[in-house]
From Swiss-Prot:
Protein name from the UniProt record: Cell division cycle-associated 7-like protein
Lineage of the species this protein comes from: Eukaryota, Metazoa, Chordata, Craniata, Vertebrata
Cross-link (Glycyl lysine isopeptide (Lys-Gly) (interchain with G-Cter in SUMO2)): 210, 213
UniProt subcellular location: Cytoplasm; Nucleus
Comp. bias regions, Basic and acidic residues: 152-167
Biased composition (Basic residues): 168-177
Annotated gene: Cdca7l
Coiled coil ranges: none
Region ranges (Disordered): 74-199
Amino acid sequence: MELATRSQIPKEVADIFSAPSDDEEFVGFQDDVPMQNLSESCGSLDSRELEKQQNVCFRSKYFTEELRRIFKEDTDSEMEDFEGFTESELNMSSNPELMESELSDSDKAYPVMNDAEEDDEEEAAPRRGRSTRRSSFGLRVAFQFPTKKLARTPDKDSSHLLDSKTDLRRKKSSRQPKGKEDSASDAEDESRAESQENSDALLKRAMNIKENKAMLAQLLAELNSVPDFFPVRTPPSASRRRTPRRAFSEGQITRRMNPTRSARPPEKFALENFTFSATKLTEELYSFRRRKTISGGKCQTYRRHRISSFRSVKDITEEDLENIAITVRDKVYDKVLGNTCHQCRQKTIDTKTVCRNQSCGGVRGQFCGPCLRNRYGEDVRTALLDPKWTCPPCRGICNCSYCRRRDGRCATGILIHLAKFYGYDNVKEYLESLQKQL
């Protein structure tokens, strides 16, 4: 920073600094320090006013009785006195740019300080405050410059701050290896304790095993001493020993898949011998013919009986007619009391037809209402009241699965819907139309 003007310090200002104090005389400025350097530092602090004035003159109105009283007062500390400026402080005052850079560096370094540095700085703060106030107090009162804040911190304070920072860093760096050493020592102690515990557990386990083995051996010895617990077994005699079976090495032995059992009945159990010899057969035929000739040639004939009961028209009651099933929903299934229909083979309790043919009987002539109407176009009520009615099997028109299979034909299945689709009332007419077309 270039100074606008350079002027010498007036005589009055020099007299103030050279005047003796209460406790110790002020020796004055050193001889080796030129007065021109001090004047340059003063001019740098008041650069704004010096730019406007080429010839700066000292104004005596600033030196009042109060100013003189302030300089004559005792310092803050009785043990510490002001001994004047050193050469480094004077050089610092001659280079204001260096002062500003150090001040800015110190201001930037303050936020980065940790808690430990703040604690250490709080202890050093009273001393710095006193020295700062003492060193900058005279300049502030003597010169009344507007830029006094820039040059308020001297080199001594900055050097003290730097020394304190370096000491704190050294302490911090010394603490870190100590902390690492402490953690390493703690880990070693823990590992030693664990190994000691493991060794103690293994030792205790070995002792327990040894004690258990000794106790078991003692118990076995006591049991062996009592003969009742362990009776002596005599080896079997040589005569009772079974002779080992001879192994067959000739040929391959086939595995028995179905071995014989003691509970299985013998072969040909409950079987009759139907084989006849020729002589015995001729004897039987001869005896049969002889009996026939003795009886006069008339053989006894047996009358064929109907399996089912024959019911005439007079035996049909009104209750039987009301019990006729018109649709499939009217049919009630009963496997005990019901009778079977020849067409559908379902055992129901509804009234069915009765064939009037003397040679027909049983299930052959029984048809339920839905089957007789859909398959043949007839009514059960009319069939029961007709004394000459015969069943479809007797007439040779039965189209059930059994009768068609007997005739060498396949079963038709449910054809009533298809027959009605083509305009026929029953399956018999539909099958007859198909037979005519073929």
